[in-house]
């Protein structure tokens, strides 16, 4: 199917989210997070398709451990909230789902700047999400990124 990808800008629309999910699954199934317990990683594009296909991924892990759980016996769902994701999902319902799925502690502001699919007003989606508390908004807009980078926050 590679020959179909350039048409309709598909590498950017569906390829990148798929590649991000592939990277997450490869790190989980390869045991990277088990081997490097203190590893801090942030995946762009809200984790790509990974958060939205976690049910399918977990089901595959459970029904075909002979193919999936070869190098790591930990359920992939157990990793939700253990690595960071950015907020660049371009959809209020998707961002709400992401927060509900992984919590507000591991999502950081994503802009994708300077690329054409970047958020034109970084943070606007976060600020517009009425289901987020003021505290959660602050976490997503800057506090989580400061924590990820090891920047001390003074009060």
Language-model features, listed with the residues they occupy:
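Mid-to-C-terminal alpha-helical segments outside catalytic/metal-binding sites
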Residues: 39, 48-49, 72, 84-85, ...
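Histidine/acidic residue-rich metal-binding segments in metalloenzymes
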Residues: 1-78, 93-105
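Short beta-strand or tight-loop elements
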Residues: 81
